[in-house]
Structures are given as structure tokens and as C-alpha cells.
Amino acid sequence: MDINITLIGQMITFAIFIGFTMKFVWPPLRKALEERREKIAEGLASADRASRELEVAKRQSAEILREAKAKATEIVENAYVRAHKVDEQAKEEAIAAADKIKSMAIAEIEQEKVKAKEQLKQELVNLAMAAASKIIAASVDEKASKKVLEDFVEKV
């Protein structure tokens, strides 16, 4: 292999080409590759961060859901207790009202009973007076007074 001027020219041209490439082409190409590598690394880091945030959000949502269920259970239990209290209060009020009505009815019955006794007493007095006057008027005849007394007893 002979080294001649053409080969030396090609070597010089190639060296200039390599120098030009290293000076002007390689830095932007290397910069583009570095930016691409950084973007990929940033994208992976972002995806990893998003994955962790998603996991945290899932845990938080599960905790919030658990708290909401506990609160709902508590609300239902409180509502049940309140309803039971209202039911008991209504029963107590109904019993009190029934007792009051019963007491009033008993009092009214007692008043009617006293009134009826008074009327009966008054009627008995009137009948006794009538019988006594008939007995006095008919005291001469024993049969007549016996009949008057029997009539009186039948009326009573």
C-alpha cells in the first residue's frame, strides 16, 4: 500500500470533517441526547411519583370511606335511639292521657253516682212521706195499711 498525496488529502479532509463534526455537530447532538435522557428520567420519576401519589390517594379515599361508613352507622344508631326515645315518650304521653281520661271518667261516674243516690234518696223520702200520709190516713184499716206498705216496697 502506497501512501500518496490523495490518501494524505483524504486523511486531512477526514480529520477536518472529524474536527468539524466534533466542534459543531456533536455538541448539539449530544445535548439533544442528554435532554432526551433527562426527559425520559423525568417522565419515569413523574410516573413513579404519580404512582405513589395514587397509592396515597387510594389510602386516603379508603380512610375517608371508612370514616364515612362509621359516621353513617353512628347517624343511623342515633336516629334509632332518637326514634326509640320518641316512641317511648309517645307511649308515656298516651298512658298519661289515658290515665287522665280514666281519672276524669271515674270522677264523673262518682259524681253521677252521688247524684243518682241523692235523687234516689229524695225519691225515697217522697215515697216514704206519701206512704206515711197514706198509712196515717188509713190507719184505721190494717189491711189497707199493709197494702200501702207493700205498694211502697214494690216502688222501692
UniProtKB/Swiss-Prot annotation:
CDD domains recorded: ATP-synt_Fo_b
Transmembrane segments: 5-27
Membrane-topology descriptor: Single-pass membrane protein
InterPro entries xrefs: ATP_synth_B-like_membr_sf (IPR028987), ATP_synth_b/b'su_bac/chlpt (IPR002146), ATP_synth_F0_bsu_bac (IPR005864), ATP_synthase_B_chain (IPR050059)
UniProt keyword list: ATP synthesis, Cell inner membrane, Cell membrane, CF(0), Hydrogen ion transport, Ion transport, Membrane, Transmembrane, Transmembrane helix, Transport
The UniProt record lists the keyword rRNA-binding: no
GO molecular function: proton-transporting ATP synthase activity, rotational mechanism; proton-transporting ATPase activity, rotational mechanism
Organism superkingdom: Bacteria
Compartmental location: Cell inner membrane
Gene3D superfamilies (alphabetical): 6.10.250.1580
Predominant location: membrane
GO cellular component, one term: proton-transporting ATP synthase complex
Family per record: Belongs to the ATPase B chain family.
NCBIfam families reported for this sequence: ATP_synt_b (TIGR01144), PRK05759.1-2 (NF004411)
Protein function: F(1)F(0) ATP synthase produces ATP from ADP in the presence of a proton or sodium gradient. F-type ATPases consist of two structural domains, F(1) containing the extramembraneous catalytic core and F(0) containing the membrane proton channel, linked together by a central stalk and a peripheral stalk. During catalysis, ATP synthesis in the catalytic domain of F(1) is coupled via a rotary mechanism of the central stalk subunits to proton translocation. Component of the F(0) channel, it forms part of the peripheral stalk, linking F(1) to F(0).
Subunit and partners: F-type ATPases have 2 components, F(1) - the catalytic core - and F(0) - the membrane proton channel. F(1) has five subunits: alpha(3), beta(3), gamma(1), delta(1), epsilon(1). F(0) has three main subunits: a(1), b(2) and c(10-14). The alpha and beta chains form an alternating ring which encloses part of the gamma chain. F(1) is attached to F(0) by a central stalk formed by the gamma and epsilon chains, while a peripheral stalk is formed by the delta and b chains.
Protein name, UniProt field: ATP synthase subunit b
Organism: Francisella tularensis subsp. holarctica (strain LVS)
Gene label: atpF
